[in-house]
């Protein structure tokens, strides 16, 4: 299990409605749906395969109704300490990028920031990821994928990201749901620019396209290839994963 050498903010936006699960009769909210005996969000955090010591600022953003319904003290054991933060929202936002900005006062600084989806798992070497992160302003873990269900990063010959597109296949490198920034303040800056320009995909402000504003500003964004990515985001995805 990897120990972090530097401080880092790790943020999980989990403030959606999970309506597709609700429509199919699931009674738990998506992050708390059982995945082989543990809540989905626990599987996602444990998938990092990291020791969460005082070098981490762990932040979760959830709906107030979910915080009231579930016992968040389970995260004491999952994370291994009680120094994490929970930001509660009264209602859903207009997309995950806007949700993450609700923690602006925590992440708008020079600390590295990694945001991660609450419904994706990966096979990867996280130590190699963080070694690579030291060389870039941002890094996007990716896997080889196809179809328009994912977001994609297109790179130049030198390996730097040229463009990121949400729900549109512009390459065969699909993003794995984890997004690293060497400074959290960069994410805040470029996410706010994207929202100010009202640049949406299917009506929402997604996280992956924020890198486009960083690229336009001359930031060096790299791609880190993971071995495999598993989506748990829909009832069909979850069943496929559990049966795999």
Language-model features and meaning:
Residues 1-12, 20-22, 26, 34, ...:
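Conserved N-terminal catalytic core of the sugar/cofactor nucleotidyltransferase
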Residues 2-10, 174-244:
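Conserved alpha/beta core of the MobA/IspD/sugar-nucleotide pyrophosphorylase nucleotidyltransferase superfamily
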Residues 10-12, 60-61, 115, 138-141, ...:
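Structural beta-sheet core signal
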Residues 15, 63, 118, 143-144:
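Cofactor-binding loop segments of dinucleotide-utilizing enzymes, especially the Rossmann-like FAD-
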Residues 32, 152-155, 223:
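A structural signal for short hydrophobic beta-strand segments in well-ordered beta-sheet cores
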Residues 110-121:
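Short beta-strand-to-loop acidic/aromatic patch adjacent to the donor-nucleotide binding site
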Residues 122-198:
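Conserved core of the sugar-phosphate nucleotidyltransferase
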């Amino acid at each position: 299990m990897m120990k972090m050498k530097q401080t880092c903010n790790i943020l999980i936006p989990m403030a959606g409605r999970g309506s597709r699960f609700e429509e199919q009769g699931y009674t738990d909210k998506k992050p708390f749906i059982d995945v082989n005996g543990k809540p989905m969000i626990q599987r996602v955090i444990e998938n990092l395969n990291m020791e969460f010591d005082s070098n981490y600022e762990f932040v979760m953003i959830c709906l107030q109704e979910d915080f009231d319904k579930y016992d968040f003290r389970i995260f004491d054991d999952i994370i291994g300490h009680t120094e994490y933060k929970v930001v509660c929202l009264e209602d859903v936002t207009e997309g995950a990028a806007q949700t993450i900005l609700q923690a602006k006062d925590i992440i708008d600084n020079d600390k590295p920031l990694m945001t991660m989806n609450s419904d994706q798992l990966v096979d990867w070497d996280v130590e190699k990821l963080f070694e690579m992160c030291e060389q870039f302003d941002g890094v996007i873990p990716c896997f080889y994928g196809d179809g328009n269900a994912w977001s994609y990063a297109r790179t130049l010959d030198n390996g730097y990201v040229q463009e990121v597109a949400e729900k549109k296949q512009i390459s065969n490198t699909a993003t794995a749901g984890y997004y690293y920034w060497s400074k959290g303040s960069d994410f805040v800056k470029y996410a706010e620019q994207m929202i100010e320009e009202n640049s949406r995909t299917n009506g929402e402000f997604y996280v992956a396209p924020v890198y486009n504003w960083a690229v336009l500003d001359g930031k060096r964004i790299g791609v880190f290839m993971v071995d495999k990515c598993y989506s748990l985001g829909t009832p069909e995805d979850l069943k496929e994963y559990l049966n795999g």
